Amino acid sequence: PGKASIGNPAAGSMPHLLAGRLAMLGGFQITNVPFAGSGPAIPQVMGGQLAGMSSPLGDWVQHHKSGKIRILATSGPDRAVFTPDVATFREQGFGELMVREWFGFFAPAGISEAVRQNLNTALRQAMGQQDVRDFVTPLAANLEASTSAEHTRRLAEDSEMAKRLVAALGFKADS
């Protein structure tokens, strides 16, 4: 009941927008508290100064597994392999809040097709190496390669979703 202070890693970030939309859909009010990344907010959540946090899963997995915090939901289409005990928003009746976190590699416009293909090949090879996989596992990241076309499509889809969330929330960036 009332307002709860919910942290996010940056004003206007997808976690910020998702928390705002969850509050709208759930019929409750929150005060969004933006941070410079998730790190500074973690002790405040663990200490009870913040009611919660909307941020990337990898920031919280170790604290969830240790019992210091409880992850309430994940935003992916399926339960995360790192937290199979945590239901998705979709499973909890908030299917609209389905977002996959991803990281992409970008290059300057106008690079040659040969350079683009070489970069793509090198990235795919690196992602297949065990030491790279071992490095990202503690970050709760799944390595998944995509083509440039798939990446472009995902970027467009996510941009459209962000536009809808911004409009629904009436979010205005500080100028």
Regions found by a protein language model. Name each.
Residues F35, S54-P56, T74, V99, ...:
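Short beta-strand and adjacent tight-turn residues that come in two discontinuous sequence segments
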Residues M24-F28, E113-S175:
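An extracytoplasmic/periplasmic, membrane-proximal ligand-sensing/linker region
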Residues V33-P43, P56-D59, A149:
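Short helix-initiation/N-cap motifs at beta->coil->alpha
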Residues P1-P40, F89-E91, W102-F135:
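Hinge/capping helix and adjacent helix->loop/strand transition within the periplasmic-binding protein
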Residues A19, Q44-M46, H64-G67:
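Hydrophobic residues within well-ordered alpha-helices
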Residues W60-M127, E160:
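C-terminal lobe and pocket-closing loops
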Residues G2-A4, G26-F28, M46-S55, K68-R70, ...:
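Alpha-to-beta junction loops
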